[in-house]
Amino acid sequence: MADALASQLNNTSLGDANSDAKWKDQLKTPAKDARPQTEDVTATKGLEFEDFYIKRELMMGIFEAGFEKPSPIQEETIPVALTGRDILARAKNGTGKTAAFVIPTLERINPKSTKTQALILVPTRELALQTSHVCKTLGKHLGINVMVTTGGTGLMDDIIRLNDAVHILVGTPGRVLDLASKGVADLSECPTFVMDEADKLLSPEFTPVIEQLLSFHPKDRQVMLFSATFPLIVKSFKDKHMRNPYEINLMDELTLRGITQYYAFVEEKQKVHCLNTLFSKLQINQSIIFCNSTNRVELLAKKITELGYSCFYSHARMLQQHRNRVFHDFRNGVCRNLVCSDLLTRGIDIQAVNVVINFDFPKNAETYLHRIGRSGRFGHLGLAINLINWDDRFNLYKIEQELGTEIQPIPQNIDKKLYVYDSPDTIPRPISNPSQPPQATGMPSGQHIGDRRHNNHPNGGHYQYNRGRGSYRGGRGQGPRRNVQHDQNRYNASQGQHQSGKSQAAPVS
């Protein structure tokens, strides 16, 4: 169907090619991203954004944001979404899903109307901020107003902002329902309803809220669902609330092709030493380190700074303004390392992240998939390293089976071609804050992580001390894979010799 629509639009081509070239020459586009990309985003049908015949003002925003050609999910989604048909789209993390629904949503907005014309729901506050920023960036020439609303911020401020025209409302379900129930957010003439990370939004935690929100929309609404995974509950929602949806499935495999995955077996009490070894050996542009609890996030962030590395942290118990500050600064390259809980597993797009470390191994395949998807964004290369203890060995095997992937034992030396770019300073941040200084995009690859000092923020989320060289070098035992007693990846804090016996759960140390 997407091919037929694109062909039909092609046959109705209007305008002069010379005049088209002139307006494109006047755009202030960022430097071209010269990094190689995988087939996750390059296996396209050869369409251009011009083939969708969207408003010129919208195309100006698209090109000025650094987009060059539509990715496969964008090629499939945009022409169908422009017809107003319901869409159920499944594609990998980091392949351009956000722009796939933002572009047709922006195209269908009437800026002369004061009514809210699109609601975009996301499961986390950070993702809401990012999505609203994408809307504002791509639609900056359209004269529309985009508002983001999430829990943890003042309700009265949102009520005041809704007194003005809001064309697109981006938010988390609970806060949007609160505003709609109070009659402050008028969704009665809102024809577009979008859910990003739909599998999370349709979990038992959110489903009742989602169904209440749908009742505020007109019956002839367009519903679009996007996610990397679709459990059975999504099918139930589709049958109940969607009309003959156009289904897109670009998931021939679950994991991104550009991400290399390794595991290292290490006792709990040796994890920090192992992390120090990884920091000293890897060439990190930016890294995200995941823990399974908020307490461990702060403890680990403190340990990392004691090793001499600059580090931010973020988790759900922090004040929202502090979380926002951490997220903003990390996206703009102020710090190299971020320790966090699963708060940032979904949808967060930070192009400069080339390493993800699971300090605590996740309990299920879905969480693992979303975590490692923070690297290797938009077809680029990335590295995922999992620190595995005795209790994680069965989860490791189960996740490999469910995802149809293989997590390799970590080698003594990791080939830099798998995750390192020659000039990380040139990595573009197409959806970034234009007011940020240009030096925030990264650091030369030859410079050791943490070699620059950063100012502390007055409030939580930022651990930063002076740089100190770590001297620990982890050793490796020898033995068959999956033999926990003699794992070839087992790190030892002293001489690299085997240690037998089950490791005991211990605090970060």
From Swiss-Prot:
Disulfide bonds: none annotated. A motif (DEAD box) lies at residues 196-199. Keywords: ATP-binding, Cytoplasm, Helicase, Hydrolase, mRNA processing, mRNA transport, Nucleotide-binding, RNA-binding, Translation regulation, Transport. Residues 258-418 form the Helicase C-terminal domain. PROSITE patterns: DEAD_ATP_HELICASE, HELICASE_ATP_BIND_1, HELICASE_CTER, Q_MOTIF. Residues 19-38 have a biased composition (Basic and acidic residues). It catalyses: ATP + H2O = ADP + phosphate + H(+). It is found in: Cytoplasm, P-body. Residues 78-248 form the Helicase ATP-binding domain. Its main location: cytoplasm. Residues 7-16, 432-444, 490-503 have a biased composition (Polar residues). It comes from the Eukaryota. Pfam families: DEAD, Helicase_C. A motif (Q motif) lies at residues 47-75. SMART domains: DEXDc (SM00487), HELICc (SM00490). Its EC number is 3.6.4.13. ATP binds at A91, K92, N93, G94, T95, G96, K97, T98. GO terms for molecular function: ATP binding; ATP hydrolysis activity; RNA binding; RNA helicase activity. The Q motif is unique to and characteristic of the DEAD box family of RNA helicases and controls ATP binding and hydrolysis. ATP-dependent RNA helicase involved in mRNA turnover, and more specifically in mRNA decapping. Is involved in G1/S DNA-damage checkpoint recovery, probably through the regulation of the translational status of a subset of mRNAs. May also have a role in translation and mRNA nuclear export. This is ATP-dependent RNA helicase dhh1. It comes from Aspergillus terreus (strain NIH 2624 / FGSC A1156).
